[in-house]
């Protein structure tokens, strides 16, 4: 008489955690295997994480040659007052907007670069 998979599963379900650990160790020893989980390659996981990025930070790297136009662009993009926008531009590199979607980040970058600023999207 052979034991079915269902009978084995029922027997394991009735065991305590310690008994299951002992069973696994005995199986590893008897069959010369290990019960280690498969490890995902680090490179593949990193590539997927980069592809799944949905929030971006827009960083003002420098104001460039036309500081006044950049301050106006910063005011329009952020809704800051003149004093705050000037302080942000003077303090470059500085985060301009954080946690925005890809389309907004790209549009903001294009707008600021058109005004003469150097911008990074991270």
Swiss-Prot record:
One of its GO terms (cellular component) is cytosolic large ribosomal subunit. Keywords: Ribonucleoprotein, Ribosomal protein. It holds the Pfam family Ribosomal_L12. One of its GO terms (biological process) is translation. It comes from the Bacteria. The keyword Repeat does not apply. The keyword Nucleus does not apply. GO terms for molecular function: mRNA binding; structural constituent of ribosome. Belongs to the bacterial ribosomal protein bL12 family. Forms part of the ribosomal stalk which helps the ribosome interact with GTP-bound translation factors. Is thus essential for accurate translation. Homodimer. Part of the ribosomal stalk of the 50S ribosomal subunit. Forms a multimeric L10(L12)X complex, where L10 forms an elongated spine to which 2 to 4 L12 dimers bind in a sequential fashion. Binds GTP-bound translation factors. HAMAP family: Ribosomal_bL12. This is Large ribosomal subunit protein bL12. The gene is rplL.
